[in-house]
């Protein structure tokens, strides 16, 4: 989903997860097409004009997934991303960063970082997507989010303590700063090593975007 689509969408569409993906992102690419042409800078991925600081330890290649819980395409991408993470080389450090293209995205940013602070991302991350896109629940506001989290067996008071904390607010702000530093134009999107950016529009689809990340990581290992 492109940034301009978020700007044009109304509150009803946001809650329903009914925003439309640009045609370019929905296109498919066959394995033969991927193998027949090496990814090209400026076409399949972007090299950032200014490097972005990374959080990965020395010797690790940081890969960031930018996402939004209410984005249907992020929901669709999750199984493929999870499978890719499981088979990724050990030198890749993968982390998720929720975006905030508008102020009303911030509650879901805080949701993710509160779950992270409580060690509940592995347990509840996919369930958040399911609640929004399968059960059609509106988790766009703090009260609805807290009520849903409580139904998952999480102490509501402790969750809200994290949700409203300075540390979670700071992480949300830094997430938005990181999104802007990478010049994220839509989600899902992938940032690599503070140097490269790709998404479904550039790569033609997100499966190929992951292949491009593999290509870029290989280049970093070889000193390119």
Language-model-detected regions and their locations in the chain:
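Extracytoplasmic thiol/disulfide redox context detector
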Residues: 2-103, 218-224
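C-terminal cap of thioredoxin/glutaredoxin-like
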Residues: 5, 151-224
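Solvent-exposed loop/turn segments at secondary-structure junctions
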Residues: 70-73, 100-104, 131-134, 167-168, ...
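Sec/Tat-exported extracytoplasmic proteins
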Residues: 67-70, 81, 85-88, 115-119, ...
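Extracytoplasmic/secreted proteins, especially bacterial periplasmic and envelope-associated proteins
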Residues: 62-65, 76, 80-83, 106-110, ...
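Structural microenvironment flanking redox-active thiols in thiol-disulfide oxidoreductases
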Residues: 87-118, 122-150
